[in-house]
């Protein structure tokens, strides 16, 4: 059971706190000036009691007793002059360990919050998401329209396809024939003119398919592996006379 606090205890505590906080000598007159509500007799008795209890140091000077704080063994006081509870090294280390553990928890929490903040910052805003949704919706409608066109478009009949193949084959055949005819004529001219092909080309001014970057129509009548873009052993001359 805790000790009941009496008025005497309060007086002792107030006087002791005043002297310890000021940390300078006091006589009863100075205490009386600080606490006008206390009487001289009460102050003198209280100072004497504190001195006898070893809570204050005192000495008589010229028939006046001076009291001051015990410097060597006095307890540590806070800013208000109250005694600070003393703790052992073990208690302090244990308290420090607890603070360090709490610090680690707070640091982990901070890291987690920073990570969450970065993730939120990297996410699209509602406005950006709506813009992207609108763009994708527009692209989807365009693709659906193209798909519908392909689905409803009339497919080429076999007859039309055959007609197109025949036209391509005929065009290629005529192309090959004319290239061969020109090559034969060119060989005869070269044989009679005694000129080199390069010189004769400069005089006449013809251009080859390669000069004009024209590719031979593939021969679709052959397997894909045998199709060529130009005839073998053919210099692919394409006639273009100078005017």
Curated annotation (Swiss-Prot):
Lineage top rank: taxon: Eukaryota
Localization per Swiss-Prot or TrEMBL: Nucleus
Coiled coil location: 86-153
Primary location recorded for the protein, binned into one broad class: nucleus
Biased composition (Polar residues): 223-235
Gene Ontology cellular-component terms listed: condensed nuclear chromosome; DNA recombinase auxiliary factor complex
Ranges where the record places region Disordered: 217-243
Gene Ontology terms, MF aspect: double-stranded DNA binding; recombinase activator activity
Keywords attached to this entry: Coiled coil, DNA recombination, DNA-binding, Meiosis, Nucleus
GO biological process: homologous chromosome pairing at meiosis; meiotic joint molecule formation; meiotic strand invasion involved in reciprocal meiotic recombination
Family of this protein: Belongs to the HOP2 family.
Physiological role: Required for proper homologous pairing and efficient cross-over and intragenic recombination during meiosis.
Protein name as catalogued: Homologous-pairing protein 2 homolog
Organism: Dictyostelium discoideum
């Amino acid at each position: 059971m805790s000790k009941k606090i009496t008025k005497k205890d309060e007086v002792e505590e107030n006087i002791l706190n005043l002297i310890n906080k000021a940390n300078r000598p006091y006589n009863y007159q100075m205490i009386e000036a600080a606490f006008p509500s206390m009487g001289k007799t009460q102050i003198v008795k209280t100072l004497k009691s504190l001195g006898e209890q070893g809570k204050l140091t005192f000495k008589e000077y010229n028939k006046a007793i001076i009291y001051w704080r015990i410097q060597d063994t006095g307890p540590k006081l806070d800013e208000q002059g109250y005694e600070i509870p003393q703790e052992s090294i073990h208690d302090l280390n244990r308290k420090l360990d607890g603070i360090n553990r709490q610090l680690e928890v707070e640091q982990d929490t901070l890291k987690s919050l920073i990570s969450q903040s970065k993730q939120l910052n990297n996410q699209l805003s509602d406005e950006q998401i709506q813009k992207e949704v609108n763009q994708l919706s527009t692209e989807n409608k365009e693709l659906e329209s193209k798909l519908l066109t392909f689905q409803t478009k009339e497919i080429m009949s076999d007859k039309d396809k055959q007609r197109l193949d025949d036209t391509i084959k005929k065009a290629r055949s005529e192309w090959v024939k004319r290239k061969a005819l020109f090559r034969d004529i060119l060989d005869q001219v070269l044989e009679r003119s005694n000129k080199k092909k390069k010189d004769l080309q400069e005089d006449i001014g013809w251009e080859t398919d390669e000069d004009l970057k024209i590719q031979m129509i593939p021969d679709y009548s052959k397997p894909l592996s045998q199709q060529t873009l130009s005839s073998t052993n053919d210099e692919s001359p394409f006639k273009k006379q100078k005017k």
